[in-house]
Amino acid sequence: MASDNRVYVFDTSLRDGEQAPGFSMDPRGKRRLAHQLAELGVDVIEAGFPSASPNDFQAVFGIASEVRGASIAGLARATKGDIEACARAVEKAERPRIHTFISTSPLHRLHKLNMDKEQVLAGAVAAVELARRYVDDVEFSAEDAIRTEPEYLVEIFSAVIAAGARTVNVPDTVGYSTPDEVRELFARLKREVRGAENVIFSCHCHNDLGLAVANSLAALEGGARQVECTVNGIGERAGNAALEELVMALRTRYERYGLITGIDTTKIYPTSRLLQNITGQQVQRNKAIVGENAFAHESGIHQHGMLKHRQTYEIMNPEDVGLSKSELVLGKHSGRHALKDRLTRMGYRLEDAETDKVFTAFKALADKKKEIYDADLEAIVLGITGGAASSFILKSLSIQSATGETRMPTASVRLATPDGREVCEAAVGDGPVDALFRALSRAIGAEITLKSFHIRSISFGSDAQGQATVEAEWNGQEHVGRGTSTDILEASALAYLDVANRLIKVRAREALAEAA
């Protein structure tokens, strides 16, 4: 047990967060985010659900093998197969944790598990005992704990603590509770659970009623000392408690809570930006702590007050969360050493071969735009290290568009194919982007159903890079592709091809599975 005022931050962006539609990440993106979370100072990184799929297993195994500075956890149902898979996935971690769970509420016992209280209790104890054979650090979660009988929670937590659990987690799985209820429940559990003084109580709050952060703070007041959260509050349905909001609430209102975390708050904004770039999903402008408007002041009255004294309308300093105007860091005359130094200060550790690729892409971009910002460099790095391996490669594209009643936008593309050939196709469409996607679909020979398409600027100025995100469906599976360029049509084409290249990987895996 640590000091009573230390709060452990358990980040589940890579597991609960990544399960949300539109937030899927490829393996390299997951590893990059895991490294950033370790630099941020989170205590536990829940890297995934190893038994969910071979890809999830490999992602957890890769993170456990290379990320240091934080405990690496994998999620496992209370079954032998799940726990053994999780143990293998985290075995290379510096500090491995198995996080096992079983549903405990009457609703889940009856309709999900078809088990009675005694069976659930026995399953929970057996799961913890099995997990302890592999690791010393075992966390147990009572799924849907908030809707579970409090006296039964006391019984089951007492039993799993006796079986060897070091952390017991109380999830508000459906975001149903209120702060007063959460505070009272945690206080009761701390009083009545046998062995409570030997473990850490944890909260895991969902945001269905917009109360995830408030409920998490209430849990801390009730005696919890671990908070489970995600960067930007991502997660299933309405999301999870937002890491940045929890951490800054504790820091800003220390006089009320008297609690500290190990988070380096100056890395909060860069971490938020990294997640946005990996997933292509922006936070809303008025998002607390990391939104574009979080430290903006439009009102004349507010601006006047800010000029007089900053604290009249700001309770935090932007610099405290790592937010400052993106500095102009490099230009076309900058050399390799300056680039590598800047990337290192941004938190990127690249192999020499990756640095060479980034430098080449940087020089090409510097010829197109005068000012290179951190966000530009970040997009280059993620494009080099984070995407699917190129299979179809865009060689050229041409768009002809016109306005008026007789307009008929036309797009033609030339691609290098996976087998080394070149293919050219053209198509007309309702607009230039539609024509472009139709031409690309013909060229790759696959019918991809477009679900959504959006593009955003990732830096500043009229020559800023645009990042296009394509969400598409193929054979019942959803895929997300991203592309970045100073030309928004080229960015759109690259995003579409990113989806196509991911499909090739899926087809290859399916072929191997059938052959096996």
Predicted features by range, described:
Residues F49-P50, L75-A78, I102-S103, E143-A145, ...:
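Short, ordered loop/turn segments at secondary-structure junctions
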Residues G69, P171-T173, E228-E236, T252-T261, ...:
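Short beta-alpha connecting loops at secondary-structure transitions
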